[in-house]
């Protein structure tokens, strides 16, 4: 449920509320859990989303990087695309030098996966971020 709440709050623009849940996301990682059920969202992805909402950029980058390594090792193509999408949202929010270029690359990669899997709503979300 935590993953759904954090992701939902971020998608609704309630970043401060999602940020408050970051300590709980870190607790899940501390238990050794890798995936949250029933949404099959990686704990590191969830922590990255919450850290992004809290503007803890370095922590978010680390969580997304670990999550991507896990998703590639499993492999889980859908989670890879989701990690990229949420990482992009963090990069666009942070807006540091080079972030926009990196975001564009990640979005193109996510778009390929969403297209191959056949996820039209996610394709729309990625295309709106590309603009």
Segment roles from a protein language model:
Residues 1-131:
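Helix-coil-helix junctions within alpha-helical repeat/solenoid scaffolds
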């Amino acid at each position: 449920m935590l993953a759904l709440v954090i992701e939902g709050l971020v998608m609704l623009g309630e970043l401060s509320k999602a940020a408050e849940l970051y300590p709980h996301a870190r607790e899940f990682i501390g238990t050794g859990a890798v995936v949250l059920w029933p949404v099959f969202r990686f704990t590191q992805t969830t922590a990255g989303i919450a850290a992004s909402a809290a503007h803890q950029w370095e922590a978010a980058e680390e969580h997304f990087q670990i999550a991507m390594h896990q998703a590639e090792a499993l492999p889980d193509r859908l989670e890879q695309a989701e990690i990229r999408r949420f990482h992009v949202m963090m990069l666009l929010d942070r807006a540091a030098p080079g972030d926009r270029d990196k975001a564009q690359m990640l979005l193109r990669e996510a778009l390929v996966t969403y297209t191959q899997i056949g996820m039209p709503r996610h394709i729309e979300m990625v295309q709106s971020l590309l603009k």
